[in-house]
């Protein structure tokens, strides 16, 4: 099944899923203030964020493997049903252990990015995959911009309103999938080994595949570097530019919009014109240059033109995903996408800890060091990019 209708449905599902995730983020600290002692809010908030990323790391490979066996549609629908029930319970039961349990369930059901990626690989011809992966990233980005904005507005009415809205949104997403989503991969009714449920073992399938292993290493590094702005943007903006909360929110919205536009309208043409390899290199170069410029920026307005570079750097990841998806057959797309989603979640757990530690250690002397370290990490990708196998994995 290779139709535009299928692509529209899965992109709509990804967008609504991202909005649902973003809806609850602005109110989590406020909700914690209502149910725990004020001195422990920061620690609880950090644990809740880490729990979400940890569950995605543990469950993304499993969901990907399940979708290879049973098909993409039932796994996606089951996850959406679980998310709907989870958000509905959290909206009506303001108890700390329920909040923790809810973030665990949300992390499990939010690991569907792997299945969505496999779905797109199923319905897309090789030459269009980079563009369609870019569209998927753009839709997720749009949802993550719209979700927090809507969550903040609803949170002003009630701290529980965003959770209720997320439940409704996931319910609508479930209905969309039930009536409009077609199966893209019938699956193989073969037994699932126990190692499929081990997130570490889920990477072993790539050990004998030189190209895949090298490209997954590049993927991990790129995702790790991407954690630098995620972890530092707010605190760096406050310390370096003296930005207010309103200004920080505005800058995040602008960056989200620019990133979505680049993913939607630049990735496809750039990949078709220059090839996947050059698109990846160009993305890393733009990102690294943006980091270096931010490290030395002295005025808040300078960050906004630099955002264009950072957004342009986003073209590299969809090109890399497309390249990776062509290295495995259709029956293992879910396993591949699950491994990639697990790597992303792993960087979401470790990246902020590493980046903020560097920032804290250097802030008293020069708070731009973490950006330079992030840019330098791209150099680690060069050995993988120079491998002889790399040239065989690219298309022009």
UniProtKB/Swiss-Prot annotation:
Transmembrane ranges, per UniProt, are 7-27, 46-66, 80-100, 104-124, 139-159, 161-181, 211-231, 247-267, 278-298, 300-320, 340-360, 365-385
GO terms under cellular component:
plasma membrane
Give the Cytoplasmic membrane side ranges. 1-6, 67-79, 125-138, 182-210, 268-277, 321-339, 386-396
Membrane topology classification? Multi-pass membrane protein
Gene Ontology BP, a term: response to antibiotic
Going by the UniProt record, its keywords in alphabetical order are: Antibiotic resistance, Antiport, Cell inner membrane, Cell membrane, Hydrogen ion transport, Ion transport, Membrane, Plasmid, Transmembrane, Transmembrane helix, Transport
Protein origin, superkingdom: Bacteria
Q: Where, in residue ranges, is this chain on the Periplasmic side?
A: 28-45, 101-103, 160, 232-246, 299, 361-364
Q: Where does the UniProt annotation locate this protein?
A: Cell inner membrane
Summarize the biotechnology note. This protein is used as a marker in many commonly used cloning vectors, such as pBR322 and pACYC184.
- Pfam families from the entry? MFS_1
Q: Name one GO molecular function term.
A: antiporter activity
Principal localisation: membrane
Entry-linked SUPFAM superfamilies: MFS general substrate transporter
Its family remark reads: Belongs to the major facilitator superfamily. TCR/Tet family.
Q: What does this protein do?
A: Resistance to tetracycline by an active tetracycline efflux. This is an energy-dependent process that decreases the accumulation of the antibiotic in whole cells. This protein functions as a metal-tetracycline/H(+) antiporter.
Name listed for the protein in its UniProt record: Tetracycline resistance protein, class C
Source organism of the structure: Escherichia coli
The top of its lineage is: Bacteria, Pseudomonadati, Pseudomonadota, Gammaproteobacteria, Enterobacterales
């Amino acid at each position: 099944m290779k139709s535009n209708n299928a692509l529209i449905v899965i992109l709509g599902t990804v967008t609504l899923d991202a909005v649902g995730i973003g809806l609850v983020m602005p109110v989590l600290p406020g909700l914690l203030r209502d149910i725990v002692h004020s001195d422990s809010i920061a620690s609880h908030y950090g644990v809740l964020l880490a729990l979400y990323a940890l569950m995605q790391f543990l469950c993304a490979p499993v969901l990907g493997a399940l979708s290879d066996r049973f098909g993409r549609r039932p796994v996606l629908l089951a996850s959406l049903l679980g998310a709907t029930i989870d958000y509905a319970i959290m909206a009506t039961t303001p108890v700390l252990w329920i909040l923790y349990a809810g973030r665990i369930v949300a992390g499990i059901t939010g690991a569907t990015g792997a299945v969505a990626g496999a779905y797109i690989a199923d319905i897309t011809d090789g030459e269009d995959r980079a563009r369609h992966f870019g569209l998927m990233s753009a839709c997720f980005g749009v949802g993550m911009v719209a979700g927090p904005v809507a969550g903040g507005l609803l949170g002003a009415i009630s701290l529980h309103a965003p959770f209720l809205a997320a439940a409704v949104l996931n319910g609508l997403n479930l209905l969309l999938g039930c009536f409009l989503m077609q199966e893209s991969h019938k699956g193989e009714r073969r037994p699932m080994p126990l190692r499929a449920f081990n997130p570490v073992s889920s990477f072993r399938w790539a050990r004998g595949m030189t190209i895949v292993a090298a490209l997954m290493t590049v993927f991990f590094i790129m995702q790790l570097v991407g954690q630098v702005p995620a972890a530092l943007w707010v605190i760096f903006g406050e310390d370096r530019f003296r930005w207010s909360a309103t200004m920080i929110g505005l800058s995040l919205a602008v960056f989200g919009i620019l990133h979505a536009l680049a993913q939607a309208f630049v990735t496809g043409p750039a990949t078709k014109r220059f090839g996947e390899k050059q698109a990846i290199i160009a993305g890393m170069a733009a990102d690294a240059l943006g980091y270096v410029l931010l490290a030395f920026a002295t005025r808040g307005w300078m960050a906004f033109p630099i955002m264009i570079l950072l957004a342009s750097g986003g073209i590299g990841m969809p090109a890399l995903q497309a390249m990776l998806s062509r290295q495995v057959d259709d029956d293992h797309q879910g396993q591949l996408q699950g491994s990639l989603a697990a790597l992303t979640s792993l960087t979401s757990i470790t990246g902020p800890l590493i980046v903020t530690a560097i920032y804290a250690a250097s802030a008293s002397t020069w708070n731009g060091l973490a950006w330079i370290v992030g840019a330098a990490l791209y150099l680690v990708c060069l050995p993988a990019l120079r491998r002889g196998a790399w040239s065989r994995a690219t298309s022009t």
